[in-house]
């Protein structure tokens, strides 16, 4: 029986325009809103302290730690180190009554002033003397001997846990989140695990390393301390942003990642881990030393936004929060507690290389959070197995279902017509209608947002720096409006009940191809960044299969054809009724006008005018029901109200509610995974363009994520009413205009310019440079008084532009400004002595260079041609860290620069160097030339570096000044030997 028109309009679950518009919109809003809230609103700090922790104390410690710049090469760094040793002593002495007593936790503090190391990497040599602070809290199952006191002795047992943070900052940042919060979290971990009742089962090593900011030196030199043999797992606490949530950057394996699952507020995605593996993220953390060089298995937890404050004077306590501190601290406590309580043998086994700890090998991990409260972790092998299964089962299931439908004569897809008996010809099915819609609509919508990405990169490439949500709004509104507009046009021109099944079939094909690609990466490279594709493909497969199963509810094609032919033969012939049939061969050439005229025949040929055969217009009421205007005709009487609009008549029996199930299978999980991933990626990259990264990539990523996020609407969007798309069109126009004309920076979203002052100590030449993105770096230089009237030289430097000028502002880095001491002559800032040595057994070109600098702990030697070998007197050598050029490390061309770091001020380094002979000259003329340079990085005293003070004072408020190199000031002298 035909459904009544009123019943159809009152069904809130039917596949009509109002239910589809309301339901789809509500699902998107209901899921995207909490995703955005979770991303930006941090968990509240507990009203009362957690046992073993003191959050008020932690916040006060952070404020004290960040009261000045404290890079390795600064006197403030020494003050911070002394303060940390004092705080650790206070914590340990308060919690540990006596290490000899039963009720005390055995704790040892190592003030490491002995470890040093030489490392060569990427044609750069580094010699570093460490000043790390190491706290060892003994575990219940640890070796009771003080084995570290005996050279060559190793600990017994299952291995311990390392928690690391670095206490040095950059020379232009206070280091609140890079890495102050990590350091304070370590202090609280010491407090927590030395509190009675919290004694660890495995030993806990807390490392506060010094010298991370320049080449990860502190972590590398930690490897030389005997206690480094104990830990098999680690947790690295880092800051690559300046606040917000601490995210799980990367992990070594599934087994160790499961302990992060204990965090009360987990946050992160394996996508970031893939970014490091694929080289998309160029900067590194101490994680690479512990996991790659030493063979530990662990986690990298770090702040990642906002990048505009990273390494600037806004990385301070004022611009972070207690909520950020609590977010990292709570994760650190939960994760560490799980690791030190583990009694399994999961982290024992063969070392991953010579000299590495015997931590065994774990399985690749897939992990992501859900709304910042739940955390999914499983093996990449599981993802691979599920992917392969879906790749096989999905197409096979649809193929078998299609065969069954064809055998039952219910395969309406691709059907053109069905022949009927009695000479009526064939009944059209119009089964191809809607087949080509998805490629056209999907291609057009995707092309539109990709075109917008290129437009932004061309006209206003930096707008995403401060207005990332305006870019998102523009992309989303454009995509949805174009998709709706094209779908409505297609549905108006050629209405089809097969729109949904065809679109879903195309979507399944697309996700199947994407799943093939991600499966290859999972198996070949261990990269799981496409984890969301399997959820996408599975939901799309299930929704597509439901559409195929819906076809079983339709009559057989032959029955439908016979029914149509029977209806037509049982009533007077009409023009409207005849259109349901395709003429047979016998009826070709027969026309109504060939019949015998009667009194009802129209005076105009081919047109009947009697009331009995009057054809009326039929209108759509907007809910899918058809309203007649006039007296019923043969056609309208035969029309089934279960048929939506002018779609195929045979679609009357299709279920009206299954679309909801299909949408719920596809959309929610896609919205959650893609929505969270989109915000995570946007936060990580939208402010990286100032560092010289591609200006196009962020916009392309947002465009593609928009496509993935809203593609689940394509099977249903042709049922949308015009209200929301029209509103989105207005949003698109407004955001497009804004994104094209708005200035991309502000006081809260500053662009970074990189400062360096270079002084030629031989000639007295003094040059200041700012490096950044054009035209903004030139605009900033124009505001500097000392640059006014100077010859500004702007040259490309990597992916940025360096603008430099001669400056009259001489740095006062040897004596404090206002000191009564006389200024030290420039040529005494750096002292060196280069002596040629007797030819060796393997090389005739050998020299010894001694270098020292006043009031500095960092110098370097730059060679005009590469050296093939060098050695710093007193340096340790470790096979895990190459100390000379080698083919395996890509440094076979030699070393061009050696950086020298000392824990003492004014130290003299002695470097022996060898270089290859030049075939064009004899040995006596084969000289080695270069520069002896020292670095000064202490900007805590006003007037010490007047050029820096001036740049900070007079730069526009949308500019942040940060350091370009290891030193803010570089003083150089030329040498030849």
UniProtKB/Swiss-Prot annotation:
Stretches for region Disordered: 566-604
Keyword line: Glycoprotein, Hydrolase, Membrane, Metal-binding, Metalloprotease, Protease, Transmembrane, Transmembrane helix, Vacuole, Zinc
InterPro entries: Fxna-like_M28_dom, M28_fam, Peptidase_M28, PFF1_C, PFF1_TM
Gene3D superfamilies to which the protein is assigned, alphabetical: Zn peptidases
Main subcellular location of this protein, as a coarse class: membrane
Keyword Lipid biosynthesis: no
Residues that carry a glycan: 113, 116, 749, 791
Binding residues for Zn(2+) 1: 166, 178, 238
EC number: 3.4.-.-
Any one cellular-component term (Gene Ontology): vacuolar membrane
CDD domains with a match to the protein in the record: M28_Fxna_like
Ranges facing Vacuolar side: 39-383, 460-469, 522-525, 681-696, 748-977
PANTHER family: METALLOPEPTIDASE M28 FAMILY MEMBER, VACUOLAR MEMBRANE PROTEASE
Protein name listed in UniProt: Vacuolar membrane protease
Organism: Talaromyces marneffei (strain ATCC 18224 / CBS 334.59 / QM 7333) (Penicillium marneffei)
């Amino acid at each position: 029986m035909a459904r009544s028109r009123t019943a159809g309009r009152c069904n809130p679950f039917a596949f009509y325009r109002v239910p589809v518009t309301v339901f789809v919109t509500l699902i998107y809003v209901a899921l995207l809103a909490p995703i955005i809230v979770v991303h930006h609103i941090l968990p509240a700090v507990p009203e009362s302290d957690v046992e073993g922790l003191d959050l008020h104390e932690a916040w006060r410690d952070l404020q004290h730690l960040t009261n000045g710049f404290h890079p390795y090469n600064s006197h403030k760094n020494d003050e911070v180190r002394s303060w940390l040793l004092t705080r650790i002593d206070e914590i340990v002495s308060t919690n540990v009554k006596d290490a000899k007593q039963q009720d005390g936790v055995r704790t040892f503090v190592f003030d490491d002033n002995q470890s040093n190391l030489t490392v060569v990497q990427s044609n750069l040599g580094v010699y570093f003397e460490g000043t790390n602070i190491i706290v060892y809290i003994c575990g219940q199952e640890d070796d009771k001997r003080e084995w570290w006191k005996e050279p060559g002795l190793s600990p017994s047992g299952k291995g311990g846990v390392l928690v690391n943070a670095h206490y040095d900052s950059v020379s232009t940042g206070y280091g609140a989140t890079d890495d102050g919060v990590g350091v304070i979290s370590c202090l609280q971990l010491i407090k927590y695990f030395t509190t009675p009742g919290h004694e660890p089962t495995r030993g806990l090593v807390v490392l506060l390393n010094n010298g991370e900011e320049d080449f990860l030196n502190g972590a590398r030199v930690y490897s030389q301390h005997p206690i480094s043999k104990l830990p098999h797992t680690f947790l690295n606490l880092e800051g690559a942003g300046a606040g917000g949530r601490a995210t799980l950057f990367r992990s070594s394996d599934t087994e160790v990642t499961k302990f992060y699952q204990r965090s009360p507020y987990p946050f992160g995605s394996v996508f970031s881990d893939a970014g490091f593996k694929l080289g998309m993220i160029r900067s590194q953390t101490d994680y690479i030393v512990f996991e790659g060089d030493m063979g530990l298995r662990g986690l990298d937890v770090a702040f990642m936004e906002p990048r505009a404050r990273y390494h600037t004077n806004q990385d301070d306590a004022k611009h972070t929060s207690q909520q950020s501190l609590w977010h990292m601290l709570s994760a650190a406590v939960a994760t560490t507690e799980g690791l030190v309580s583990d009694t399994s043998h999961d982290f024992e086994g063969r070392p991953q290389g010579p000299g590495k700890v015997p931590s065994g090998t774990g399985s690749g991990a897939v992990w992501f959070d859900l709304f910042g409260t739940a955390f999914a972790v499983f093996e990449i092998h599981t993802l691979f197995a599920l992917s392969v299964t879906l790749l096989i089962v999905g197409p096979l299931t649809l193929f078998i279902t299609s065969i069954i439908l064809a055998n039952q004569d219910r395969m309406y897809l691709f059907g053109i017509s069905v022949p009927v008996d009695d000479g009526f010809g064939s009944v059209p099915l119009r089964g191809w209608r809607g087949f080509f819609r998805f490629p056209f609509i999907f291609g057009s919508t995707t092309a539109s947002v990709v075109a917008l990405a290129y437009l932004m990169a061309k006209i206003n490439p930096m707008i995403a720096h401060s207005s990332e949500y305006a870019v998102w709004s523009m992309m989303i509104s454009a995509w949805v409006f174009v998709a709706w507009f094209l779908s409505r046009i297609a549905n108006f021109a050629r209405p089809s009940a097969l729109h949904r099944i065809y679109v879903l079939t195309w979507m399944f094909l697309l996700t199947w191809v994407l799943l093939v690609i991600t499966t290859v990466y999972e198996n070949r490279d261990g990269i799981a960044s496409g984890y969301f594709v399997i959820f996408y493909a599975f939901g799309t497969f299930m929704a597509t299969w439901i559409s195929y199963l819906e076809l079983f509810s339709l009559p057989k094609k032959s029955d439908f054809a016979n029914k149509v032919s029977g209806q037509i033969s049982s009533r007077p012939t009409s023009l409207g009724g005849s259109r349901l049939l395709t003429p047979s061969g016998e009826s070709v050439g027969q026309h109504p006008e060939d019949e015998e005229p009667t009194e009802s025949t129209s005076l105009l040929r081919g047109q009947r005018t009697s009331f009995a055969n009057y054809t009326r217009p039929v209108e759509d009421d907007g809910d899918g029901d058809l309203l007649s205007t006039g007296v019923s005709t043969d056609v309208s009487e035969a029309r089934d109200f279960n048929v939506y609009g002018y779609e195929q008549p045979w679609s009357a029996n299709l279920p009206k509610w299954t679309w909801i199930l299909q949408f719920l299978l596809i959309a929610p999980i896609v919205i959650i995974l893609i929505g969270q991933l989109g915000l995570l990626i946007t936060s990580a990259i939208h402010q990286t363009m100032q560092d010289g990264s591609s200006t196009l990539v962020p916009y392309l990523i947002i465009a593609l994520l928009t496509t993935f996020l809203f593609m689940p609407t394509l099977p249903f969007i042709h049922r949308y009413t015009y209200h929301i798309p029209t509103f989105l069109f207005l949003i698109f126009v407004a955001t497009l205009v804004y994104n094209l004309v708005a200035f991309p920076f502000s006081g809260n979203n500053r662009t970074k310019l990189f400062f360096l002052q270079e002084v030629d100590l031989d000639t007295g030449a003094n040059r200041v440079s700012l490096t950044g993105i054009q035209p903004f770096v030139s605009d900033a230089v124009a505001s500097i008084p000392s640059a006014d009237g100077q010859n500004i030289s702007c040259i490309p430097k990597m992916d940025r532009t360096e603008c430099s000028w001669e400056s009259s502002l001489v740095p006062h880095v040897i004596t404090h400004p206002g000191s009564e001491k006389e200024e030290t002559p420039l040529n005494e800032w750096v002292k060196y002595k280069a002596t040629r040595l007797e030819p060796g057994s393997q090389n005739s070109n050998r020299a010894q260079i001694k270098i020292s600098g006043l009031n500095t702990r960092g110098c370097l030697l730059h060679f005009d041609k590469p050296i093939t070998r060098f050695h710093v007197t007193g340096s340790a050598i470790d096979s895990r860290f190459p100390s000379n050029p080698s083919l395996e490390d890509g440094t076979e061309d030699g070393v061009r620069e050696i950086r020298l770091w000392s824990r003492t001020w004014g130290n003299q380094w002695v470097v022996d160097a060898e270089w290859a002979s030049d075939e064009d000259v004899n040995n006596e003329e084969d000289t080695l030339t270069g520069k002896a340079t020292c670095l000064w990085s202490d900007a805590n005293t006003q007037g010490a570096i007047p050029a820096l003070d001036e740049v900070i004072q007079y730069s526009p408020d949308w500019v942040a000044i940060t350091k370009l190199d290891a030193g803010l000031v570089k003083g150089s002298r030329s040498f030849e030997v």
